[in-house]
Amino acid sequence: MASTPNSVTLYTDGACSMNPGPGGYGAVILYGDGRREELSAGYKMTTNNRMEIMGAIAALSHLQEPSQVLLYTDSRYMVDAMSKGWAKKWKANGWQRNAKEKAKNPDLWETMLTLCEKHQVTFQWVKAHAGNKENERCDRLAVAAYQNNPNLVDEGFGKF
């Protein structure tokens, strides 16, 4: 990973009404210089896990320069896949989890792995709905994104 003096803290969350169903993600970007940005988007049909990953991808993609990133998420799936090397292993095995089961969401994991080559990312789990101000904000952004007539199409939904 590239070394960088830029320090960024990200909070991300995904939400889905039904699963699958309409979904959204929310992200809060806190830059080391004190700036703050919020991102969100809603999709017509997706899953909660896809929204969790897409929220992180959107936030990481938004960063203009290679950065040292601390990414907080309430998705153990994402934290474990990245921190324990599962996503890299799935990719090395042709997107297979094991001999019988394909890895889910390979399109998103591929993008996440590429972004983690650009940025130094540490994934940190945070308990959902436990009073963490920024995680709660991301949840509100994600829910609002799917409740407000989402019109985006998750191109990878149902393809893998």
Curated annotation (Swiss-Prot):
Annotated signal sequence range: none
GO biological process, one term: DNA replication, removal of RNA primer
Name of the molecule in the record: Ribonuclease HI
Annotated Mg(2+) 1 binding sites: D13, E52, D74
Pfam families for this protein: RNase_H (PF00075)
Organism listed in the record: Synechocystis sp. (strain ATCC 27184 / PCC 6803 / Kazusa)
Organism phylogeny: Bacteria, Bacillati, Cyanobacteriota, Cyanophyceae, Synechococcales
Residue stretches making up the RNase H type-1 domain: 4-147
Family: Belongs to the RNase H family.
A GO cellular component entry from the record: cytoplasm
CDD domains the record matches: RNase_HI_prokaryote_like (cd09278)
